[in-house]
Structure formats: C-alpha cells, structure tokens
C-alpha cells in the first residue's frame, strides 16, 4: 500500500488544470493507503493504528488521529489534486452506518465526507483530544505526538472541496437489501438484523453467536435454516 501511495502522489504531482481524476473508493480504502507525513515512519504509523484500535477509542476518534498524520487520508489526496488545478469526480461505496439507501446514483452527493478523496469532518483538536482522553501520550510513538503537538494550522485537514463532484453508488442499507434478496432466492428465510451496529469485533461476535444459539435452540426470531444479515462498522 505504501509504494502504491507514492505512485499515486507522483501521478498527481505531474497533473495539471486539463486533467481529470476519476476516483472509485469503498469502505476500508483509507486503511490500505498508508502514507505518513514527513517525519513519521510507516512503522510508527502502523504502531499508532494498532495502539488506537486497542485503546477503546471509537472509530471517528481513531480516524481523527490517523487522518492528521497521513499524506493521503483526511482529504489530503484530494487537496493535492486541487493544488494542481485538476478536477476530481468521486464514486463512493459507503460502509458508514449513517448513510441512507441510495435513491438515484445519478444525483451528486452534496454532503460527502470521506478519505482520501473527500473533505474531513474531524479536526486536529479532535486528534489531540483523543490522545488526551485515552492517556496515549506515553504509548504512541514520539514522532506522532511530537508532530500533532507542533504542526499547528498547517497540519489541519481540508474541510470542503466545492469544485469536486461526488456520487454515492452503494450504502449499507443497499447491501443489506441485496443480500436479503439473494438469500430469499436460495429459499432461505432472511432477516436484516441491523445496519447500525458499531463496536468492537469481540463484542459483536459474541452478540451474533448468541442470536445463532437462540435460533438453534428455540427457533426465534426465525426458524432455521435462515440467513441473518447484519452490516456494521466494527474494529
């Protein structure tokens, strides 16, 4: 992922006002595009992510830190494209629990936030607050805490790209509906449990297992064989 990011950045740096970037991204793209700012090594960025995931922080809190130490995420790839005077059209497959079903994919998405091709809704202060809240000063790599404490306004991520156009082509409710149809075509009873689940993987795994045991033992909320569909954002 790191080498690919360097190639993408090199491509952007050779662009000009006559160029158009078509970006197609799905949930998890930012996790694959690891490219830390100067002064922070890839190893330190990876260590930071691991510590954050084990800290009990929520996904937005984690992203606030990760985005502010990245050359790609937090909209910084899009900012780099804008700095070259080029145009960006983005197509997004969303894994966010907050997005409603897609009504018409031909209508631009006016309130798109996403990394690395869209503006960032987190702030540098959010990143610093996360470190303070979970007492991570002594646990995170010194290069990370030093950068976040000293970067100032120049280290803030971009908050708007009015010149760009974004399209939402799929959301969690869309995926749930498609999975339900596919299961029913196979002759299974299909139930969408939720598209709003957020939390830690171990907790969600325990929850799903308990529901499966309930079905096996007491045939509720539906009798087997069945398909239980749950789309979530877990970490």
Task: Locate the predicted segments by residue.
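Solvent-exposed alpha-helices and their adjacent loops that cap or buttress functional pockets
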Residues: 12-18, 24-25, 70, 79-86, ...
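Glycine-rich oxoanion-binding loops at beta->alpha junctions
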Residues: 1-18, 65-66
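Accessory alpha-helical/coil subdomains and C-terminal extensions
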Residues: 85, 89, 113, 117-207, ...
């Amino acid at each position: 992922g790191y080498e690919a990011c360097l190639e993408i950045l090199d491509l952007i740096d050779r662009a000009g006002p006559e160029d158009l970037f078509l970006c197609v991204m799905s949930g998890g793209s930012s996790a694959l595009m690891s490219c830390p700012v100067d002064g922070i090594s890839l190893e330190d960025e990876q260590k930071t992510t691991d510590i954050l995931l084990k800290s009990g922080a929520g996904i937005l809190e984690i992203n606030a830190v990760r985005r502010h130490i990245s050359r790609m995420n937090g909209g910084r790839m899009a900012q780099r494209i804008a700095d070259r005077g080029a145009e960006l059209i983005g197509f997004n497959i969303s894994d966010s629990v907050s997005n409603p079903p897609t009504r018409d994919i031909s209508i631009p998405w006016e309130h798109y936030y996403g990394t690395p091709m869209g503006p960032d809704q987190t702030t540098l202060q959010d990143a610093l607050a996360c470190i303070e809240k979970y007492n991570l000063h002594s646990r995170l790599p010194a290069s990370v805490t030093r950068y976040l404490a000293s970067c100032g306004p120049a280290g803030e991520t971009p908050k708007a790209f009015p010149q760009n156009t974004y399209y939402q082509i799929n959301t969690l409710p869309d995926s749930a509906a498609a999975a339900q149809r596919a299961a029913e075509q196979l002759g299974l009873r299909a139930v969408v449990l939720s598209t709003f689940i957020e939390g830690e993987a171990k907790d969600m795994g325990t929850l799903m297992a308990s529901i499966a045991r309930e079905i096996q033992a007491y045939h509720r909320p539906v009798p087997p064989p069945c398909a239980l569909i749950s789309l979530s954002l877990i970490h």
